[in-house]
A protein has these predicted regions:
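Hydrophobic transmembrane alpha-helices of multi-pass small-molecule transport proteins
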Residues: 50, 72, 103-104, 112, ...
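Structural signature of hydrophobic alpha-helical transmembrane segments
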Residues: 31-48, 88-106, 151-164, 211-226
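Transmembrane alpha-helical segments that form core, pore/gating elements
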Residues: 50, 109-111, 115-117, 147-203, ...
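Glycine-/small-residue-enriched transmembrane alpha-helix faces in small-molecule transporters
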Residues: 1-37, 88, 147-174, 193, ...
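Specific transmembrane alpha-helical segments of multi-pass solute transporters/efflux pumps
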Residues: 18, 22-23, 51-102, 135, ...
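Cytoplasmic-side transmembrane-helix entry/capping segments in multi-pass membrane proteins
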Residues: 12, 66-73, 121-133, 154-155, ...
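Helix-helix packing/entry segments at the starts of transmembrane helices
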Residues: 39-41, 79, 83, 97-104, ...
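Membrane-interface helix-cap regions at the ends of transmembrane helices
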Residues: 21, 25-28, 32, 46-64, ...
């Protein structure tokens, strides 16, 4: 890891904006598509620009190399499972609440990084910062945290999905010596391979009559909230570590609530 620079904070903010925009787009996509189809097509559309980038930059994609099991595992844990859980959960809650729930990620990241990394141990300053950040989000958006018996299961799925993002980040650190573009392309390829037969068999998307806005949101989710976002995420992970990258979750609710209000007219 390196010392954090102003560029790193800028990239973290861009990543937060891209990921915050994912929640209202997932909501729009659910108007026409099932959660498995959303997860599959999101990964599929995300893989295309990353693979093209590897081709242009002449970067070898190692999805089927001797390290294939790392890429497959990260693809399942970091893409397949959380994408499905979040898409399923967003069906019954507002997109801005989903964004707020993601603020729990730094707590999980700090705890797991302490036990499973050598250079990101919890100390007083770090733990205080994480707790202050989380408390600030809860205080600012307490009026939006409307969880009841009708949506508590959906809220739990989103929280559970956010945990898989952290676990996937830990696994990614194990192959941080590999090129960012290669890692991103490889896990997207494996995510596509795994989800394609499952989504086709269980949801049969060819029987759908999707709305245009749902399809456009799905394409956006793939190219921007998956392909570009994961390139950024792995770059930040590699250079700044898991705990710093997880702090993106403190910015996501701010952008998520604003975008939910502007696009879906959700209450602030």
């Amino acid at each position: 890891m390196r010392e954090t620079r102003s560029l790193d904070y800028f990239l973290l903010t861009i990543l937060a904006l891209i990921w915050a925009s994912a929640f209202f787009n997932i909501k729009i996509a659910t108007y026409s598509y099932g959660p498995l189809t959303i997860a599959f097509l999101r990964i599929f559309f995300g893989a295309i620009p990353v693979i093209l980038l590897c081709y242009i930059k002449k970067i070898k994609i190692e999805a089927f190399s001797k390290d294939w099991y790392w890429f497959a595992a990260i693809g399942i844990i970091n893409l397949v499972i959380p994408f499905f859980l979040i898409a399923y959960g967003v069906q019954k809650i507002q997109s801005n609440l989903a964004a707020i729930l993601m603020a729990s990620t730094p707590l999980t990241a700090a705890a797991l990084a302490h036990f499973f990394t050598n250079n990101e141990k919890i100390n007083l300053v770090k733990s205080t910062g994480v707790l202050i950040g989380f408390s600030g989000i809860v205080f600012l958006f307490s009026d939006n945290i409307l969880i009841n018996e009708n949506n508590i299961f959906s809220a739990f799925l989103i929280l559970f999905g956010s945990c898989f993002y952290v676990i996937g980040g830990l696994l990614t650190l194990k192959i941080s010596n590999k090129k960012n573009e290669n890692v991103t392309a490889s896990i997207l390829i494996w995510g596509t391979i795994i989800l394609m037969p499952v989504s086709l068999f269980l949801e049969q998307p060819w029987n759908l009559s999707p709305r245009l806005d749902s399809t456009l949101s799905l394409i956006y989710l793939g190219i921007f909230s998956t392909g570009i976002a994961w390139l950024l995420r792995f770059y930040i992970l590699k250079h700044n570590g898991l705990v710093f990258q997880a702090q993106v979750a403190y910015l996501i609710p701010i952008f998520g609530v604003i975008l939910g209000f502007l696009i879906l007219n959700e209450a602030i």
